[in-house]
């Protein structure tokens, strides 16, 4: 077994069917790779706020970083399907694993796509100041994180990972309000500002995230490795 410990953070909200398939699949998958791991389901509460993926990732990392050496940010609706290529072993460089995903025709979505499944060491995550807390809902926060790593002089490598996509309803940005396109436009603008050096990532991320832990518990009675955080 490798000595480095892996923390898998799953940003989550209202995907119970996906989660029920994801957890047992991933637990078996990582065990077969002989990796010391833990899985953290980081959920934002239905508190009337817009979904903020970056903040709950940052919260999860802050709460569990002392028990790991490297971190994998993993979407709950993607499960690995190729044992040869979906390798979660430790690397000294950032690694993007989800390069061949079913929903994108098992092809790379775009050259700047770092979403789905990405890994890096804890030190790299901290140097990049984690994820931005300013993106609303889904969209562009993963590209922003890739840009952060690159601005820290890290080269992101891709493993030829093949992932199946679990069926799910359309992303729900808010528990009560309909989708607001202006928020996605705001995300795009923020991402371009990051790329162009107009946004200082050192002032937005791990060091500015604010949260309150509502619940912290095991998600499986059969395993100590899988835990759940409910965050406000």
Regions found by a protein language model. Give the residues of each.
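Hydrophobic targeting segments
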Residues: 4-10, 26, 38-41, 60
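Conserved donor-nucleotide/metal-binding helix-loop-beta segment in metal-dependent transferases, i.e.
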Residues: 82-106
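Short, well-formed alpha-helical segments that are part of the catalytic scaffolds
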Residues: 15-30
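Short beta-strand/loop segment that forms part of the nucleotide-sugar
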Residues: 10-11, 20, 35-47
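Active-site nucleotide-sugar/metal-binding loop of Leloir-type enzymes
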Residues: 55-70
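Short beta-strand-to-loop acidic/aromatic patch adjacent to the donor-nucleotide binding site
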Residues: 67-81
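Conserved nucleotide-sugar donor-binding
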Residues: 114-129, 145-147
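C-terminal catalytic/acceptor-binding lobe
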Residues: 134-137, 143-232
């Amino acid at each position: 077994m490798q000595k480095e410990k892996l923390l898998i953070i799953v940003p989550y909200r209202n995907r119970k069917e996906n989660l029920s398939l994801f957890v047992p699949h991933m637990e078996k998958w990582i065990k077969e790779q002989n990796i010391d791991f833990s899985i953290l389901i980081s959920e934002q509460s239905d508190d009337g706020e817009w979904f903020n993926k970056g903040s709950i990732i940052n919260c999860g990392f802050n709460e569990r970083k002392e028990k790991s050496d490297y971190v994998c940010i993993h979407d709950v609706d993607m499960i690995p399907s190729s044992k040869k290529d979906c390798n979660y072993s430790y690397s000294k460089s950032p690694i993007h694993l989800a390069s061949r995903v079913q929903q994108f025709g098992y092809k790379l979505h775009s050259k700047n796509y770092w979403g789905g499944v990405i890994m890096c060491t804890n030190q790299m995550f901290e140097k990049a100041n984690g994820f931005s807390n300013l993106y609303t809902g889904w969209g562009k926060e993963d590209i922003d994180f890739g840009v952060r790593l690159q601005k820290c002089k890290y080269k992101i490598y891709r493993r030829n990972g093949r992932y199946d996509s679990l069926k799910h309803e359309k992303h729900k940005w808010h528990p009560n309000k309909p989708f607001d396109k202006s928020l996605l436009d705001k995300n795009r603008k923020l991402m371009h500002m990051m790329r162009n050096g107009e946004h200082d990532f050192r002032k937005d991320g791990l060091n500015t995230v604010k949260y309150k832990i509502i619940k912290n518990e095991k998600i499986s009675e059969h395993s100590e490795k899988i835990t759940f955080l409910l965050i406000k």
